[in-house]
A protein has these predicted regions:
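Carbohydrate-interacting regions of secretory-pathway proteins
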Residues: 1-224
Length: 224
């Protein structure tokens, strides 16, 4: 063997300028810029305008207004999203304490929850793949502080007859701590019942209205 027999020069990877501080990489799709919800719509069957509020450069769940989803569809991706849970009321405990969710392809949930002194079930903690995989650590800092998610998603693949060819896989980093490490999903993430796969293609990213005024900011995504 010659050294050059295992070297190649094409295709040349594209140049991407990394973000500095809180800015996104040069090839990222900005899903929320702190100004408006033009990249989002209501997640119901008929779509329509997203009804969440814009406050001080963040978007905030309006309880009862419904979940929202991106107008654009995604498959494999790198997602950056920051969230802040509010100071809870007396009735906001367990799964009602700062609850929302990040629904990859509108059906695979990474949990958003205030896990400061919260004795709820561990596969429903922040950093969990909801009701499938508990986080490797509780990396939540404090109530009413910004938390940072970086999520690396490999979408499931389906064959010509809608059979599952390869399951979804996810790595989740919360506040710089790996909380899911190449976890292989068993299917979707239902509240009741067992996970299962139903064939689909590229789908929107959804954010959940769970009746709590969770705030989000600095949301961007890269197609992989």
């Amino acid at each position: 063997w010659k050294p050059e027999s295992t070297e190649w020069y094409h295709p040349v990877p594209p140049k991407v300028t990394p973000g500095v501080g809180t800015s996104a990489p040069s090839d990222a799709i900005i899903l929320f810029d702190g100004k408006d919800l033009t990249k989002w719509e209501a997640a119901g069957k008929d779509g329509g305008s997203a009804k969440w509020a814009i406050k001080d450069g963040t978007m905030v769940v309006v309880p009862g207004s419904g979940s929202i989803r991106t107008k654009e569809y995604f498959g494999d991706c790198q997602l950056h999203i920051e969230f802040k849970t509010p100071i809870p009321g007396k009735d906001n405990t367990l799964q009602m304490k700062g609850n929302s969710g990040i629904m990859l392809q509108s059906r695979y949930e990474v949990q958003v929850l205030d896990c400061e002194d919260n004795p709820t079930y561990v596969n429903g903690w922040v950093g969990s793949v909801y009701k499938q995989s508990a986080p490797l650590a509780n990396a939540f800092t404090k109530t009413n502080e910004w938390q940072v998610y970086d999520i690396y998603w490999k979408a499931p693949r389906f064959g010509t007859n809608d059979e599952l060819e390869s399951p979804a896989m996810i790595t989740v980093v919360l506040n710089g701590i790996v909380v899911q490490n190449n976890y292989v999903l068993k299917g979707n993430t239902p509240y009741t019942g067992l996970p299962k796969y139903v064939a689909h293609g590229r789908m929107p990213l959804s954010l959940q209205d769970h009746g709590v005024e969770v705030a989000f900011r600095n949301i961007w995504i890269r197609d992989l």
